[in-house]
Amino acid sequence: MFCVQCEQTIRTPVGNGCSYAQGMCGKTAETSDLQDLLVAVLQGLSAWALKARELDIIDHDVDNFAPRAFFSTLTNVNFDSQRIIGYAQEAITLRESLAVRCRLHDATATVDHPMAALQLAGNDIPTLLQQAEDFALDSDKAIVGDDVHGLRMLNLYGLKGAAAYMEHAHVLGQYDNAIYAEYHAFMAWLGTQPTDVDTLLNNAMGIGKMNFNVMAILDHGETDAYGHPQPTSVNVRPIAGKAILISGHDLKDLRMLLEQTEGTGVNIYTHGEMLPAHGYPELKKFKHLAGNYGSGWQNQQTEFAKFPGAIVMTSNCIIDPNVGNYGDRIWTRSIVGWPGVNHLEGDDFSSVIEQAQGLAGFPYSEIEHMITVGFGRETLLSAADTVIDLVAQKKLRHVFLVGGCDGSREERSYFTDFTLSVPQDCLIMTLACGKYRFNKLDFGTLEGLPRLLDVGQCNDAYAAIILAVKLAEKLGCGVNDLPLSLVLSWFEQKAIVILLTLLSLGVKNIYTGPTAPGFLTDNLLAILNDKFGMRAITTVEQDMNTILAA
């Protein structure tokens, strides 16, 4: 195997990347290699989707399937080799069906692409693993060099992140043909093994720009369905009663679960990136949406083991449920998979509910501990004039966006320490699961505004971008001239594409950590620093002094 897509990848003096029997995430070499083969098949499918569009053929089955299958290869999403093979088989079936449609329209229709006619060598895992060796992501690294390889990975992993957001938006009924056309173009292009550095850099920015549009339709999909988030207090301590825990990003799954558990006596708790759900009017109206349970995803093996109910994983992040001996209580949805655990097909949660009713539940209610969420796009925009007035009165010195992914690396304590060191005349915005490093702390208020503003999930970076643009317009300056600094933690591919989105929009001087992506060479990091001022975090004191002195 060779996988270098997440922050916890193995790093050695001779090179970075997981390349043994199992990756740091728990993904086996078998699953990793089969995912590489799936990616190659999906690149061929995208090549045919582009040809079809030339002939005015848009196959919605292909558009719906392709990003979803690609999403399954993200970190901590699907560890089930058989389901990865199933995606590859389905991709070939869709590709051949689309090719037939193209040839009915134009008998000479062909696609000149190295993956356009790729067939699986068999149905058994040993045969497919042998075939997958030809599609290892580092197969020609020694030939093209570390910089080209690193840029390919930047594009590939960024596109994976965008594909995940496309799937989240699709679940909510959002579709934009222009976005899907761009996605297929980038995916097919990556299948040609590009080597031109300038093209690779430009297309990475192109993927970032595309993702801004993806986040926009996802934002509208969520707010159209569930209303605009409102500041809402959330209890992070359990109450007595039967319980189901739901994790991931899929608000539609949460809505269905809430509807199906209403009146059953089962309380629903959010976990991880599902926390922002409590701010949506159409979700928080359910009285049995009891609160939020747990902390960052990396602690789930301990926290899920203690949860006395059923658990539903709607998207990333899942890790080995057998370690905490709760594999029989966890259920996967959609693209999520772990070998041997229950997988829910369709929209009927009755099996989960029945299991929860048969489990102990929480024996008593703990003393409440409330945190506040729900500072979404409309709420932020409504506060824009207040923020501007406070800046003008010199009552608000600076705004920090401290967010991104959480993880297990010890150095991530930086983000807790950083927020605690933010001066009292400054505000902190946060989003994504990195917030669990500090979101239960009391930061107080500034002139009536909470000093900690929870914007939402990782994709709600869109709301923060919209606020920054609006503030810049009102102040007659550029976004980079605002008293605003971004301090971002990364772990996986969604964070990569959000970084690309910010860079593509011209946002500069972003601080990132806890480490640089393992696929970015020193040369590439120097380019990003030179073009965008992107820099690695150092110490809290040094970074804070640098930011406030600017």
From Swiss-Prot:
It catalyses: A + NH4(+) + H2O = hydroxylamine + AH2 + H(+). SUPFAM superfamilies: Prismane protein-like (SSF56821). Binds 1 [2Fe-2S] cluster. Binds 1 hybrid [4Fe-2O-2S] cluster. GO terms for biological process: response to hydrogen peroxide. InterPro entries: HCP/CODH, Hydroxylam_reduct, Prismane-like_a/b-sand, Prismane-like_sf, Prismane_a-bundle. Keywords: 2Fe-2S, Cytoplasm, Iron, Iron-sulfur, Metal-binding, Oxidoreductase. GO terms for molecular function: 2 iron, 2 sulfur cluster binding; hydroxylamine reductase activity; metal ion binding; peroxidase activity. Transmembrane segments: none annotated. The keyword Transferase does not apply. Its cofactor is [2Fe-2S] cluster; hybrid [4Fe-2O-2S] cluster. The modification Cysteine persulfide is found at C405. Its EC number is 1.7.99.1. It is found in: Cytoplasm. Hybrid [4Fe-2O-2S] cluster binds at H249, E273, C317, C405, C433, C458, E492, K494. This is Hydroxylamine reductase. Catalyzes the reduction of hydroxylamine to form NH(3) and H(2)O. Its main location: cytoplasm. It comes from the Bacteria. Belongs to the HCP family. [2Fe-2S] cluster binds at C3, C6, C18, C25. NCBIfam families: hybrid_clust, PRK05290.1. GO terms for cellular component: cytoplasm.
